[in-house]
Amino acid sequence: MGKITFYEDRGFQGRHYECSSDCPNLQPYFSRCNSIRVDSGCWMLYERPNYQGHQYFLRRGDYPDYQQWLGFSDSIRSCCLIPQTSSHRLRLYEREDHKGLMVELSEDCSCIQDRFHLSEVRSVHVLEGCWVLYEMPNYLGRQYLLRPQEYRRYHDWGAMDAKAGSLRRVVDLY
């Protein structure tokens, strides 16, 4: 079970809302979100209701302002608790529909380009565990939650282009 608390103001001030499960619409509980405390679990936050818009991956910890979670604004409108698994494995493909060069990962990768010489990823097959794909190296830029399934093209995971800089397994480190 997870627990996350959203605060309207920076530094854990102002009106707040505590959540322990997926919530497709947070709008009734707060108008803006400027700080977050994650007490347990790993969470994906979304800037719009129904798990749409920019995504932000948060692990246990304190985030005193939205820049701490690489947020573009103070808009958080939905969230989901990411299930934990003991093993992680996925395949990246250079072309759509799982074609072209394929590489398999079971560990975090801070720079896909340096490690595999892939500047773009056009399809993904997540075999085990949940992952976060970042558009830039070193876990920066836009973030995309990848669950166990086949993603035949980058639009399937919500991306506007095939940029893929780094990958991180969803693991609660505590």
Curated annotation (Swiss-Prot):
Q: Which residues carry this modification: S-methylcysteine?
A: 23
What are the recorded GO MF terms, alphabetically? Answer: structural constituent of eye lens
Describe its assembly.
Monomer.
Entry domain remark: Has a two-domain beta-structure, folded into four very similar Greek key motifs.
| Superkingdom of origin organism | Eukaryota
Q: Please give the Gene3D superfamilies that the UniProt record associates with this protein.
A: Crystallins (2.60.20.10)
Q: Which family does it belong to?
A: Belongs to the beta/gamma-crystallin family.
**Connecting peptide as annotated region, ranges:** 84-87
PROSITE patterns on file = CRYSTALLIN_BETA_GAMMA
Q: Where is the Beta/gamma crystallin 'Greek key' domain?
A: 2-40, 41-83, 88-128, 129-171
Q: Extract the coiled-coil ranges from the record.
A: none
**GO biological processes:** lens development in camera-type eye; visual perception
Range of residues in the leader sequence: none
Instruction: Kindly give the PANTHER family that the UniProt entry links to this protein.
Output: BETA/GAMMA CRYSTALLIN (PTHR11818), GAMMA-CRYSTALLIN C (PTHR11818:SF32)
Could you tell me what this protein does?
Crystallins are the dominant structural components of the vertebrate eye lens.
**Listed name of the protein:** Gamma-crystallin C
Pfam families, per database record:
Crystall (PF00030)
